[in-house]
């Protein structure tokens, strides 16, 4: 399948919209977790997204879906399974660790993509991208530490006893990090599939497969869900519409035109977006340490992605 004829700048302009969209996820999840188990939140998120796409997909892309080969379908099922594991792991991590720590750890995805893509996709990563990712990840670490550190006139004072972290916090951190590894695998499979199937059928099939896996997991672990307050269904619907359909669809679409590492490193903007949205909608003013971390993340993204295609002479295999 040939790439559509679009202006080369369009994918680079659309990706920031995806960052804003996915940044709403942690807030909506936190609201929902007061009433809904984490795996059920993940199941609702993927199931609602798939149902919303169903009518349009059947009307506009029914013929393409019927013509898909088993080779494409089996990778689509694998992508759906990985997406289900990613969301189940990450959303559950928010029960045990802070939003900042969870989001920062799950956005280490670019590191895993950078490590794995040369072997599984044959892509070469520009040296400047590694430098940018390092700076951005440093900013992410600072944002995570801002939850346990205080900015004082004489410097930064961290009160946490890192030698005695509770098992729940460690579990949350591990689940978020595991979600990042799984997300990297999902992105690489998506890169492979996006050259063989158009966007809407791809995301519909992946979301549907993911929803089936998550619903099965929910029924096994939690049973049939009860009725929730009306506001909870609004949060779950927004979770499906904004970060899932809009945000992740943008990233899936961009994989057809942009290097996998570029798409993955832009996901590092999510902690920044989450902090900004919390400031406006939750009246949470970020401390100076968190602002410094946000600036580093933005700087790293800019450095790692600026004129990436002109860096071919500095590629690392």
Regions found by a protein language model. Give the residues of each.
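Cytoplasmic-side transmembrane-helix entry/capping segments in multi-pass membrane proteins
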Residues: 16, 71-76, 125-138, 197-206
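Small-residue-rich packing faces within the transmembrane alpha-helices of Major Facilitator Superfamily
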Residues: 23, 47-51, 137, 208-212, ...
